[in-house]
Amino acid sequence: MPKIVDHAQRRDEIALVACRVVAEHGFDGASMVRIARAAGYTTGMLAHYFDTKQDIIIAALRLILRRIDERLTQPVAARARPDLLALLTEALPVDEHRRTECAFWTAFWGQVSTDKRLKRINSWVHREYLRVFERCLTQCWPECSQWSPAKREQVLRSLVTFINGLTASAVANERDWPAARQIEQLRLQVQLLHAWAKGSARASVTRQAAGA
């Protein structure tokens, strides 16, 4: 019998290889030929699944986002009250596997400003990224449901902005940002945001009571 090929799985495999190639050689150095060679395919076989390098990059972005989503949501299902710090750490380059993902991510950011299609894709990715982290925030800090929409948005975007900045710093300066230091800085940011949100909420209640 002829071998049954799982084309979706093969596309994911190629996208994962592209992620590693971009992380190692940069966006410009990740040619179709280099990606095909790293995947063990001919360029003709690669073209059967993707028309252009940009299509591979977009597939890799979707794959990384899906994997981050899985890592952040599976622990939530396993525990009644997950720890926000532990979940958010899953998005940082704290080991070789996640460092590769993050190196790809930061390389992609460098292309967004000059490519209209990638800019549109980045807008979609950012919305999905916010959605994933919003779910984490709701699971870990149930009290945030009592916050105003503006406050939830501010806390959420502050977290994501911090993680993006920390990711870029850790990818660019690996020796200066070992995993322990990344986690410690993230812990401090989470604590500061939580304290600010709780203090702001108490102040709001006090003002409302005074007005009554």
Task: Give short role names for the model-derived ranges.
Residues 3-10:
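Short, Lys/Arg-enriched anionic-surface-contact patches
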Residues 74-75, 97-106, 116-142, 157, ...:
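Amphipathic alpha-helical packing segments from all-alpha helical-bundle domains
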Residues 119-123, 141-212:
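Hydrophobic/aromatic-rich alpha-helical bundle segments in the mid-to-C-terminal region
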Residues 59, 70-101, 149-159:
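Hydrophobic alpha-helical connector segments
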Residues 13, 17-55, 59:
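Helix-turn-helix
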Residues 62-67:
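Short, basic, alpha-helical segments at the C-terminal edge of helix-turn-helix-like DNA-binding modules
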Residues 52, 111-116:
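Short loop-to-helix capping motifs
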